[in-house]
């Protein structure tokens, strides 16, 4: 199995004005990211608007990603949900040829107990043909995968790590401290990636790296190599932009920035709506500052 160290971009799904998938823009986005030095790509994650893409679109997006990638970097594919049997069925019907790992979000809305979360992931791992990365994002799911549960998951065959986006550095440290080295903790929060790596995490799955793949990758590499002064200097450039990515929902912000950069349109599917004029203005201002700082370093 490929080791998922460094930066993984949680790829957006570009849409045309009619809200159909813009596969050409998707190809360009992938090439932009890989050629800029990201370590792996994530297809059909939360940032990809997976809640509002069809089964056929998901399969086509994966096919396109694998074709463009052509084996250059590892590929992670997202399949998750709050119906364990249905998630297993979707895993069984998916084509994993060329896929290196599965990213699966914690069950949301029905708020299972910690034992239920554990049994959900155990059942998925037993049926999945590739290694599984659990995903803790309580801000979206309404439930936190506790450190104790993550530690239990580290003992399950075929679960190789957790994408930790609880925002709790103490929880991340507890997981890192009490799991084997081969159980990977990956930051799911762009602004907490550097401090989480300082505790022993191995990288980040990032939203911002869609737009600044070279600089974000440089930051993560510096942190992994314990060059924290350099990593923090780069991180400081993103502190104004990052909250704007979420101000009106993800990927609304990052798609607005990608449109500003000429990479794809900012179209999203309902119930998400495009960014307000006020937010677009703030994103433009923050982008000007970042590009100016790039030019000066």
From Swiss-Prot:
Pathway: Amino-acid biosynthesis; L-lysine biosynthesis via DAP pathway; (S)-tetrahydrodipicolinate from L-aspartate: step 3/4. It comes from the Bacteria. Its EC number is 4.3.3.7. The active site is at 135 (proton donor/acceptor), 163 (schiff-base intermediate with substrate). SUPFAM superfamilies: Aldolase. Its main location: cytoplasm. InterPro entries: Aldolase_TIM, DapA, DapA-like, Schiff_base-form_aldolases_AS. Keywords: Amino-acid biosynthesis, Cytoplasm, Diaminopimelate biosynthesis, Lyase, Lysine biosynthesis, Schiff base. Belongs to the DapA family. Catalyzes the condensation of (S)-aspartate-beta-semialdehyde [(S)-ASA] and pyruvate to 4-hydroxy-tetrahydrodipicolinate (HTPA). This is 4-hydroxy-tetrahydrodipicolinate synthase. It comes from Cytophaga hutchinsonii (strain ATCC 33406 / DSM 1761 / CIP 103989 / NBRC 15051 / NCIMB 9469 / D465). The lineage of its organism: Bacteria, Pseudomonadati, Bacteroidota, Cytophagia, Cytophagales.
